[in-house]
Amino acid sequence: MKRRNFIKFTTISAILFSTNISIAKNIPSQTLLVLDEVLNIIFPKTSTMPGAKEFKALEYLIKNISHKTFDDEDKTLILDGTKDFIGSFSQFLTLNEKEKKELILEIIKNSAYAKSWVSKITYYGIEAMFSDPIYGGNFNQIAWKSINHAVGIPRPLKTYGQKI
């Protein structure tokens, strides 16, 4: 295992073991690594916007995919799509950033299934970027701050409509 992948693996393991999310512990580490890489390709850090790592897109996705209210079809598409992607492109994690981006762009041009998979990951990445931090993304309101968003009031005190 390359040093870089080892670091990613240990980071993802820390995410899993620091939570009480049962489904996350059932997601293979390679699936998490691929999802993390794809999110970082879709949401790169720019001079004005945070990248997927900064707004914690993977943590948001894992936290929310594990909740009972998460759409089952979306969960299936994300997890099975990632499994299929790994099966078709097992070398993905060994590619450099440019090659990874080119591969993602190529598959969404040639496969409706891949396009819907990437689209769904993008959808939840946008949610992670702009949702209230209580849901696990938008770490320290980083995305809100990057667009000078005025925070809505009242902010949620608990997640998913739980009673206070």
Task: Describe the role of every protein-language-model region.
Residues 4-24:
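N-terminal export signals
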Residues 22-55:
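Immediate post-signal-peptide N-terminus of mature secreted/exported proteins
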Residues 11, 39-43, 66:
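Short amphipathic alpha-helical segments enriched in leucine
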Residues 37, 49, 56-164:
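Mature-region segments of soluble proteins
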